Amino acid sequence: MEKIELVQKMKCDHEGEEYLIEVFARPDGSHFARTIFSPSDVIISDGISLDEVLLKHQDLLPLAIHSRQMHFPSRTLN
């Protein structure tokens, strides 16, 4: 199993709500960031460097939050 290391934790405020971002390093030097909305709802961003993965994740997080707040009308079958 690949050994990963938690290298940074930060909270991101979006529209008055705080979201935890955890950043991990892999043995090969690459990184990934993770935000857990629920046990079955997680977003992950991959990157080569810590800076790259943080930029990607901070761009993705508002979109992920917004998509979870959208209400889709139920579809009916005719």
PLM region spans:
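Homeobox/homeodomain signature
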Residues: K9-D13, A33-R34, D51
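Short N-terminal "domain-start" leader segments
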Residues: M1-P27
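A short, structured beta-strand/loop element
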Residues: Y19-I44
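Mixed-charge, Lys/Arg-enriched low-complexity segments
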Residues: M1-E2, S40-N78
